[in-house]
Amino acid sequence: MNTMNVNIVTPNGSVYNQDNVEITVLQTVGGDMGVMYGHIPTVTAIHTGYVKVHYTDGIDYIAVSDGFVEIRQEKTSIIVQTAEKAEDIDVRRAESAKERAESHLNNNDEDTDINRAKRALERAENRLKVSDLLK
């Protein structure tokens, strides 16, 4: 079976790079997308969610924020603001971030940036969901 490379990049640099990938599953704006070697070249937006990478020796789950993916026949490049492997997620920190975001959303203070609080809540809930995929 032909395999490909998957690289996930944030503003801080590459946070995930895996060779020998058999299939990658992405959550795009058009729905879930499976990518294998030889896929037609594509660029599309992805939602906050997770990337599931099946490679020769196992499966990785990576929590990602909104971003873009560039697919070539032999390589998939994912460009996002944040990315974190499931096993690296600090569950207590994610729970704390979720509680803070919910508190901000429930606070009727006009100084509260509602959109920012909603994004923070979405990221925290996503991190918790992805960490649960390992159980």
Swiss-Prot record:
Cystine pairs: none
Topology versus the membrane, per the UniProt entry? Peripheral membrane protein
Q: Which residues lie within the region annotated Disordered?
A: 90-115
In alphabetical order, the GO MF annotations are: ATP binding; proton-transporting ATP synthase activity, rotational mechanism
Domain of life (superkingdom): Bacteria
- Which SUPFAM superfamilies does the annotation name? Epsilon subunit of F1F0-ATP synthase C-terminal domain (SSF46604), Epsilon subunit of F1F0-ATP synthase N-terminal domain (SSF51344)
Q: CDD domains in the record, alphabetically?
A: F1-ATPase_delta
According to the UniProt entry, which residue ranges have a biased composition of type Basic and acidic residues? 90-103
Which key words tag this protein in UniProt? ATP synthesis, Cell membrane, CF(1), Hydrogen ion transport, Ion transport, Membrane, Transport
Gene Ontology cellular-component terms listed: plasma membrane; proton-transporting ATP synthase complex
Localization (cell): Cell membrane
InterPro entries recorded: ATP_F1_dsu/esu_C_sf (IPR036794), ATP_synth_F1_dsu/esu (IPR001469), ATP_synth_F1_dsu/esu_N (IPR020546), ATP_synth_F1_esu_C (IPR020547), ATPsynth_dsu/esu_N (IPR036771)
Listed under subunit, the entry gives: F-type ATPases have 2 components, CF(1) - the catalytic core - and CF(0) - the membrane proton channel. CF(1) has five subunits: alpha(3), beta(3), gamma(1), delta(1), epsilon(1). CF(0) has three main subunits: a, b and c.
Q: Which family does it belong to?
A: Belongs to the ATPase epsilon chain family.
Function summary: Produces ATP from ADP in the presence of a proton gradient across the membrane.
Q: Which PANTHER family match?
A: ATP SYNTHASE DELTA/EPSILON CHAIN (PTHR13822), ATP SYNTHASE EPSILON CHAIN, CHLOROPLASTIC (PTHR13822:SF10)
- The name under which this protein is listed is ATP synthase epsilon chain
Give the encoding gene's name.
atpC
